[in-house]
């Protein structure tokens, strides 16, 4: 299996995000707070998912600034998608989070057509 051309870029991106989140340099959008409450995603699960996550989509031209979609798993094995800003911001902005629907995602990484 070949490595996609964006692999190194995605690895550098998640590494930078992990460092900031581990040091507490992140904040939640109001939307993320609302969605985390509705979807029962506690702060610890955000941290766990980012700590072992990978960037699966990149949105360099997102309307509020570059962001990406991270897939990570909690220690309980729960898959979580987290959309967050790139690490170029002083604080990582958590934009939204949800548990991916298997009917919409294959292996939680690739959108079904």
Annotated model-derived regions:
Residues 1-113:
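Ribonuclease/tRNase effector modules and their secretory precursors
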């Amino acid at each position: 299996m070949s490595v996609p051309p964006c692999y190194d870029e995605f690895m550098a991106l998640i590494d930078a995000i992990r460092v900031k989140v581990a040091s507490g340099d992140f904040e939640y959008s109001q939307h993320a707070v609302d969605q985390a409450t509705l979807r029962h995603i506690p702060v610890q699960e955000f941290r766990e998912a980012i700590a072992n996550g990978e960037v699966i989509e990149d949105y360099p031209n997102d309307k509020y600034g570059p962001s990406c979609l991270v897939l990570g798993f909690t220690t309980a094995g729960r898959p979580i998608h987290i959309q967050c800003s790139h690490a170029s911001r002083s604080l990582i902005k958590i934009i939204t989070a949800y548990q991916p629907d298997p009917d919409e995602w294959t292996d939680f990484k690739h959108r079904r057509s």
